[in-house]
């Protein structure tokens, strides 16, 4: 910014005009004005002009113009009151004052802003130190809370094991608390709960660092709160409201690790369930063999049932299964003869005798062949043998009772070796008599 400094005699001039100025270097008489070249301003003014905005430059220009108008008005009112030298000195001082005022008016502003910034920086450092102390204190309190919860968990487990509780209500409440806590948060003695923020590690290589993690986990933390609400409640119980304001950065990674381990356990459990999906019932080796034998027998019976009625005895092993007694076979043969006599018109009559003869022939032809009986046939045969033994024992008991009654009715026999032999022979004959008849 340049400015022309006017110097000369102002006699006879009523009002100065901007067009009355002459070019630099021109000279005039006493009534003329002389325009001098502008003096170089100090370096500080240029620096201030660079730092100040365009608005400050505009205000400085307006101030200079206002002062020039005021000086012109004063000269118009009192044209002869001042001397040229005094006028020039006053004008120089008036013109130099607006150039010097920015230096004096702006430097205190800059110094004031610098002082404000320095105070703000010092205050920030002081608050950072206070915040660091508070965070350290919060970590210590949370560590103490975790230790107290672990101790409480151990005491409850020991009380549950030793049954030292006073009444049934306390025992029931303790069981419920242990069940809910173990279901939501797992065992408190796990090393996972003893880890703190300093011991945490990143799960993924793209994970945000721990310093800037708090600003990026608000949304993830809300999801973790919904999934692990009981765990957060148990974590917040030992702390006050002011201490529980910032649990995000410390517990969010714990939740991530817990969810990762839970997903791995879920995958392992699914693999184990898929392995045993085809065998819903756990069986021992002996039970499996027995089941295979029974299934084999069922397959044989199914194949036999699918055959025709004429081949009913073809799938039976000879000599096994239900066999008729001699008296029953004779009675059935007599019934068959009577049916044949009565039903002459019927073309097809079932002949049991022919089937029994056929079975006997097959049994004679296959005597040398040793076949393993099926489980069902073996059970039927064992049951038949047991029934036969029981019937024989009952018959023997009845005969013995009859013999005892007959012995009581017989006359007294003198003792002797010959009489004893006769008595025993007679008893044995009585016992074996019904078997011989059969």
UniProtKB/Swiss-Prot annotation:
Composition-biased stretches (Low complexity): 18-32
Region Disordered: start-end pairs: 1-111, 354-390
GO biological process: acrosome assembly; axoneme assembly; cilium assembly; homeostasis of number of cells within a tissue; mitochondrion organization; single fertilization; vacuole organization; vesicle budding from membrane
Residues that span the membrane, as ranges: none
Keywords: Coiled coil, Phosphoprotein
Biased composition range(s): Basic and acidic residues: 53-72, 359-371, 378-390
Domain of life the protein comes from: Eukaryota
Presence of keyword Transcription: no
Family recorded in the similarity comment: Belongs to the FSIP1 family.
Protein name: Fibrous sheath-interacting protein 1
Protein species of origin: Rattus norvegicus
Lineage of producing organism: Eukaryota, Metazoa, Chordata, Craniata, Vertebrata
Underlying gene: Fsip1
